[in-house]
Amino acid sequence: MEGSWRDVLAVLVILAQLTASGSSYQIIEGPQNVTVLKDSEAHFNCTVTHGWKLLMWTLNQMVVLSLTTQGPIITNNRFTYASYNSTDSFISELIIHDVQPSDSGSVQCSLQNSHGFGSAFLSVQVMGTLNIPSNNLIVTEGEPCNVTCYAVGWTSLPDISWELEVPVSHSSYNSFLESGNFMRVLSVLDLTPLGNGTLTCVAELKDLQASKSLTVNLTVVQPPPDSIGEEGPALPTWAIILLAVAFSLLLILIIVLIIIFCCCCASRREKEESTYQNEIRKSANMRTNKADPETKLKGGKENYGYSSDEAKAAQTASLPPKSAEVSLPEKRSSSLPYQELNKHQPGPATHPRVSFDIASPQKVRNVTLV
């Protein structure tokens, strides 16, 4: 505490002396804007004419370094200096060590008893972290997969790219801010691997030409035997629509052909049935026409009990000759013929059956009255 007060008193004494003496020196060239990474060094140069007595460096309007002809006045070890003399000028360099984001701001170089000053801006960027969820990725050969890389805590936001040390049939990536978190950048790599290798996610700060990378191993395994050849490449939407329309038209055509075929079969069946019925009618008509003359010739009904004389004569001639006898059958034996006679020829009186054996048969003509 006492040392800092002594430094302040020394600066005040020097300023008082310079104010009393006066001078006509000036700043030839002031510092330039600088952008650095956190924890690195920042360098600023200020060129002045000879004859100066006191040169001061300020950061965000606070004096961090003072130089006199006798030597520097250092109040913080993070701020050091270097100087260079030439024939007509003096160059003072301010070095800021272990730069932090809080150091961002205005840096000025000024001379005592001079109205001019040189000003620049210090920008501090932070290189955050990279993260890939898995250090060893295992995927199936020939199947699409994706890998995500997260960049967190970067200011300003980095540009993310990928370096592929693996054979692929297709690869692409897209980087974007995470929704709701503007300090987090995501990059998604889509690829179809064909072999083992490594994938490297690279985040780069364009202003500083500084980058950070993260590498992961990619292991490719063969697809299961059951899944080989099951799924082919996906068809585009237009091809699917075209196939659907073609199948619909084919189905409609098949239905129409089936309907036409059924109609033709029904028509043919009706035609065949009509032809068959016509043939039956024609055959029936022909039979009717043949039967009409025979029916007209017949004048009565057919007598099924008639037998011709020739047939009776032949039957009688074949019998052996017997003597004529008259036999009266017994009552028991005559009952059956009598009953049969009653069935076939009813009559008011019954007589005993008499049979004659005639050696030479006579012709008998039977007449049936209708």
From Swiss-Prot:
Residues 25-239 are extracellular. Interacts with MAGI1 at tight junctions, forms a tripartite complex with NPHS1. Interacts with LNX1 isoform 2 via its PDZ 2 domain, it may also interact with other isoforms containing this domain. This is Immunoglobulin superfamily member 5. Residues 284-359 are annotated as: Disordered. One of its GO terms (cellular component) is apical plasma membrane. It comes from the Eukaryota. It is a single-pass type I membrane protein. GO terms for molecular function: PDZ domain binding. Glycans are attached at N33, N45, N146, N196, N217. Disulfide bonds join C46-C109, C149-C201. Provides, together with MAGI1, an adhesion machinery at tight junctions, which may regulate the permeability of kidney glomerulus and small intestinal epithelial cells. Mediates calcium-independent homophilic cell adhesion. In testis, it may function as a cell adhesion molecule rather than a tight-junction protein. It may participate in the adhesion between spermatogonia-spermatogonia, spermatogonia-Sertoli cells, and Sertoli cells-Sertoli cells. Residues 261-370 are cytoplasmic. The chain crosses the membrane at residues 240-260. InterPro entries: Ig-like_dom (IPR007110), Ig-like_dom_sf (IPR036179), Ig-like_fold (IPR013783), Ig_sub (IPR003599), Immunoglobulin_dom (IPR013151). N-glycosylated. PANTHER family: IMMUNOGLOBULIN SUPERFAMILY MEMBER 5 (PTHR44991:SF1). It is found in: Apical cell membrane; Cell junction, Tight junction. SUPFAM superfamilies: Immunoglobulin.
